Amino acid sequence: MPAIAVLAAAAAAWCFLQVDSRHLDALAGGAALNNANFLDNDQWLSTVSQYDRDKYWNRFRDGIQDDYFRNWNPNKPFDQALDPSKDPCLKVKCSPHKVCVTQDYQTALCVSRKHLLPRQKKGNVAHKHWLGPSNLVKCKPCPVAQSAMVCGSDGHTYTSKCKLEFHACSTGKSLNSLCDGPCPCLPEPEPLKPKAEKSACTDKELRNLASRLKDWFGALHEDANRVIKPTSSDPAQGRFDTSILPICKDSLGWMFNKLDMNYDLLLDHSEINAIYLDKYEPCIKPLFNSCDSFKDGKLSNNEWCYCFQKPAGLPCQNEMNRIQKLSKGKSLLGAFIPRCNEEGYYKATQCHGSTGQCWCVDKYGNELAGSRKQGTVSCEEEQETSGDFGSGGSVVLLDDLEDERELGPKDKEGKLRVRTRAVREDDEDEDDDKEDEVGYIW
């Protein structure tokens, strides 16, 4: 028995020496190999926290994806292998639900763990699979050259558009560039929309102005007929008389002829400017612009005269239209029916058929005080204007060649000249109006 015990002890000692010698040989061989690449040194690898138990360097700083570089050959020379000190993930801190993935020494991405497949076990060996490597192989790497930053549709700033496309490719997201430069994108300035020119005057104001101008022209025409007698030497004789047109009766056609200084039956800006007093009537220019149907900057005689035939500006005609709408084609018993002239204004004499009373009115239908009587009354057919153009009075056209004196029957007519005669007030004595006052009526 003692001999057997001695033999067993000797055999155990010999086995220990064999194992120990093999271990030393392995360490010696490993040290020699590590002279070529120190990454194969198990002792060095154990001190690096980012390497897993399989001792393969993982540049994603996460043990879950350490199989990304399973195909990396650690026996390559160091200049062709990976430099751990240049791992870009060392400077990146991802959120708890993401891990760091690098493409090269300058590109690091935080990838969601949802893109990682769960571990599958075969026996007692853990096999880890991840779709990232296959995706990254398909994605086009970005050049090292610097480029302009862009803001992605995910709200993150990328150093280049290529980096944005690479991130979209590697993560499977649909991303696009919102703007150049860092996020957030500044709102783009709205394109200047052409502002529609707003008319300075409403339609009602234009109609009222046309009505006042028509009254003014009527007063000018009336005064011209009183003080001016055409002579055989008048250069205006022999040309077309616009006043004979159906829509240019009396004062409208007469005023057109006076303004048409070159006798071309068109009023240009220089001719219309004779009545442009923008300081007092800012709606004059918009009125004539609205009457220029052909938009050629000129007014024909038809355009001129139609400009003053606004239905809404004819008081008596408007009243007749209102009565017709109320009656709906039936006769209104006991209703007052006004009498209108051809221009759409009230006639001077108005009578009520049911009561037999008559009275005098102006062209706008305003009854003259004390004129109402039973039976017929005598009213002047041409009433004074309403004074809408101001308190200065009505306007008389005079000859430029004449002196500033009272006109006689032998005076001549030439270019336009403007003077005023005072309007007699109802409450003033006739002795107070002896001399005319020169000036604009505005």
Curated annotation (Swiss-Prot):
Organism in which the protein naturally occurs: Mus musculus (Mouse)
Tissue-level expression: Predominantly expressed in the postsynaptic area of pyramidal neurons.
PROSITE patterns: KAZAL_2, THYROGLOBULIN_1_1, THYROGLOBULIN_1_2
Residues of this chain annotated as glycosylated in UniProt: 386, 391
Compositionally biased intervals (Acidic residues): 425-442
UniProt keywords, alphabetically: Disulfide bond, Extracellular matrix, Glycoprotein, Heparan sulfate, Proteoglycan, Secreted, Signal
PANTHER family tied to this protein: SPARC OSTEONECTIN, TESTICAN-1
Main location: secreted
Modification(s) after translation: Contains chondroitin sulfate and heparan sulfate O-linked oligosaccharides.
UniProt xrefs under Pfam families: Kazal_2, SPARC_Ca_bdg, Thyroglobulin_1
Protein name, as recorded: Testican-1
